[in-house]
Amino acid sequence: MLEQMGIAAKAASWQLALLSSREKNQVLEKIADYLEAQTDDILRANAEDLAEARANGLSEAMLDRLALTPARLSGIANDVRQVCNLADPVGQVIDGGLLDSGLRIERRRVPLGVIGVIYEARPNVTVDVASLCLKTGNAAILRGGKETWRTNAATVKVIQQALQECGLPAAAVQAIESPDRALVGEMLKMDKYIDMLIPRGGAGLHKLCREQSTIPVITGGIGVCHIFVDETAEIAPALKIIVNAKTQRPSTCNTVETLLVHRNIADTFLPALSKQMAESGVTLHAAPSALPALQNGPAKVEPVKAEQYDDEYLSLDLNVKVVADMDEAIAHIREHGTQHSDAILTRTLRNANRFINEVDSSAVYVNASTRFTDGGQFGLGAEVAVSTQKLHARGPMGLEALTTYKWIGFGDDTIRA
C-alpha cells in the first residue's frame, strides 16, 4: 500500500513543482472554501473521534489537542487563506553572479519533493501541512494518530476534492488511514519516495524516527520552556506574561513549564505569583528554594520531583525554582531545556543580551511570552512544525523551510579551461 502511495506522491510532486504561484493559490482558496462548506461532515467525524478518545481515557490535554469546533475550523480555513497571501519562495534567486569563466551562476529555491509527516492528536496539522506543502510545490504523505483517523480522513477527502477540482492529482496530499503501527516503521524506510520526514509528537516518536528513519528527519516540537525572572523585573508585567505563557493554551509546545526566579526578587515576587496562579487554577511544583515562600500562599503547591524538570506538562502545572543568579538559571536551562523557547523578564539590557547570547534555543524572548513561537505569530503563515535542531531548519518552519535549492549555470557555449 505505502509503495503505491509513494509512487503516486512522487509523480504528483513533479506536476506540483511546475505550478505558478497563481495556480497554487487557486488550489488553496478552493481548499479553504471546501473546508467551510463541509464543516458539518468534518465536525461529525471529529465528534466520533472525541467520543472514542474519552472512552479510552485520554487526558484533558490530549482531548483539547484533538477537538475541533466551528470556530477552530473557521480559523483553520482562514489560515489557509493567509498562506495564499504569503510570498511564494519557489523560483526565488538566493544569490549568484558572473564568474571569471564567463558562466553566470545562480542559486534558486525549488521544492523538496515529497514531505512525510507523522503526527499525533492534532487535526489542524493535516490542513497546515497540506497548505504549506502545496504552496511550495511539494506533495505530502500524512500519518496522523489513531485518535484522529476519522477527522483526518474527512479533512483529506476535502483537500483531495479541491485538488481534483483544479485539475491536479488527489495523490498530491495523501493520508495513511490504517492505525497499524507497523506502517510507521515502513514509512520510515521510504527514502526512495519521501525527501524529508517531520515527526510531530512526543519524545518517543522523535526517538523512533531518529533511530530508524532512512529519510532525513526534522525533529522538534517538544517544549520544556523556561522563563527566568531577573532581579530587575517589574512584578505586574512579569505576572501578566507568565499567566499568558502558562494558561492561554496549556496543551501547546510553547507553553512555559518551569519558572526560574532570582533570589533577590523572590520574597516579593513569589507571594504575588501564588495569588495569580491560584486565580488561574495553576498547580505549582516548588523546589526547596521556593517552597517556604509559596507553601502558605493561596495556590496549590507540591514539592517538585527532580524528574519533573524534564516534563512537558501540557497542563496547568508549573515548576518554580529560586536561583542564585543568572549563571544558575542558564545552567538549569542548558540541563533541562529542549532548545525550544525560553524567556527572560528583565529591565537590564546587559542581562537581556547575555541571556540571548548564552541560551541556545530556537527562540529566545526578552520581556515577552513564550507563546509567540508559532508560524502565524512570526509572520510565516501556518507552520509545518517547530524545529529544535539546527539542520535543515530551526524554529517555526514556514514556507522557506519546505524548499531546497539548485545551482543553475548559464553559459554561452562555455567550457571549463
From Swiss-Prot:
Give the pathway annotation.
Amino-acid biosynthesis; L-proline biosynthesis; L-glutamate 5-semialdehyde from L-glutamate: step 2/2
| EC id | 1.2.1.41
Q: Which EC class does it fall in?
A: oxidoreductase
* InterPro entries registered for this protein in UniProt: Ald_DH/histidinol_DH, Ald_DH_C, Ald_DH_N, Aldehyde_DH_dom, G-glutamylP_reductase_CS, Glu-5-SA_DH, GPR_dom
UniProt feature coiled coil, ranges:
none
According to its UniProt entry, the function of this protein is described as: Catalyzes the NADPH-dependent reduction of L-glutamate 5-phosphate into L-glutamate 5-semialdehyde and phosphate. The product spontaneously undergoes cyclization to form 1-pyrroline-5-carboxylate.
- The protein here is known as Gamma-glutamyl phosphate reductase
Q: Which organism is it from?
A: Klebsiella pneumoniae (strain 342)
Q: Name the gene behind this protein.
A: proA
